[in-house]
Amino acid sequence: MRLLHVTQSYYPFLAKGGPTVKVRSLARGLASSGNAVTVLTADLGFDRAKREISGAVPGRWGFEASENGVEAIYLRTRGRYRSLTWNPGVAAFCPERLDGFDLTHIYGLYDLIGPRVASACRRIARPYVVEPMGMFLPIVRNIWMKRLYHDTLGGRLLQGASRVIATSEQERLELLEGGIADSKIVVRRNGIEIPGQFPPAESFRNQWNIPRDAKFVLFLGRLVSKKSPDLMLEVFSQWNRRENGSRGSVLVMAGPDEGDGFRQHLEGLAAQMGLNGRVLFTGPLYGDAKWAAYRDADVFVLPSQNENFGNTAAEAVACGTPVLVTDRCGIAPMVDQRAGLVVPHDCAALEAGLAQILNDAALAARLREGCKGVANSLSWAEPLAQMETLYRELISERRGQ
């Protein structure tokens, strides 16, 4: 199959979060099984990309690269507002290249590339699928702009799709409530790529001077309001007070911010709560540094307002670390009472769950053991096979076979 994957952000721009990693994993997996895969995305910085991608070269529409059998085309960015980019090269790409693909997979909402490609697909009767990646519900920041997007570009994008991909039952219900037909929705979980070898135990603790006997709580993700890092601080503060300042306990807040001052706001909150020396803001962690943090933590917490899946929780589980997630995370049913605890999205419930995992050694040991079984069900093999089957079905429908 000749497949086009369209995404606002792609490797090596990892600061844009989990979608960047997910699209790369899917593209590489599909290419490894013999499909011709092209990724169309935005150029968010050629200088950085050429340092991290072997063979990245200037191209007609921006720059191009080939990695693990995947052709990546980074459209030149002519304007930008937050994560939204203007990439006029998509107008030339579509008439010249789109007819050469059997199917297009569009990731995410609230960008301008996906709707333009979808419109071109409809004109030439090419099937496309849309994977909202948890963006369907406008929850935080610029909500009125997101609603305007749905009323204009987003509505046509989704209604014209052959299928809409949800990564959890939670996201499927959100799509149904938003008017997407049940017959159009396909549920496909995410997978994770686990390194062949983890960093040595205690390497993260040693690097950041976290004592071996200290309770190490990990929050890892973008520092944005949707993921509730401010609530994480409040939960940790309350747990510390309840434990009378548990000796040496540390909260690591790892992840990029969006340059909007939110990290500074969080640092100020930590100081107001008297957590100086107890909270470490490490910035983003990638590669071995990320896996070392997961491995050394006593518990990983994902206190999000809404997560279509929760890749970071899955990665923590793969490292054998118990997780505490809210019931608004798509991964919750997979981990509940097996690899972690699931609680409502409020401070008291999260603090109680944190106390359970940190204070009950038998529970923590049971959850660590349970992580093994959950981790075995989180590879990309099944999701990739499901996508290939779906793609072939839609291509056959178009050809009338």
Regions found by a protein language model. Give the residues of each.
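Conserved donor-binding/catalytic core segment of Leloir-type glycosyltransferases
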Residues: 4, 211-227, 233-236, 252
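Carbohydrate-associated surface elements
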Residues: 43, 170, 191
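Glycosyltransferase donor-sugar binding loop
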Residues: 46, 192, 220, 248-267, ...
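A short helix/loop element that forms part of the nucleotide-sugar donor recognition site in Leloir-type
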Residues: 53-61, 197-210, 241
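Nucleotide-sugar donor phosphate/pyrophosphate-binding loop at the beta->alpha transition
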Residues: 127, 137-160
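Aromatic "clamp/platform" in nucleotide-sugar-dependent glycosyltransferases that forms part
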Residues: 305
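Short hydrophobic beta-strand element within catalytic cores of glycosyltransferases
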Residues: 322-325
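Conserved acidic donor-binding segment of nucleotide-sugar-dependent glycosyltransferases
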Residues: 337, 341-348, 356-362
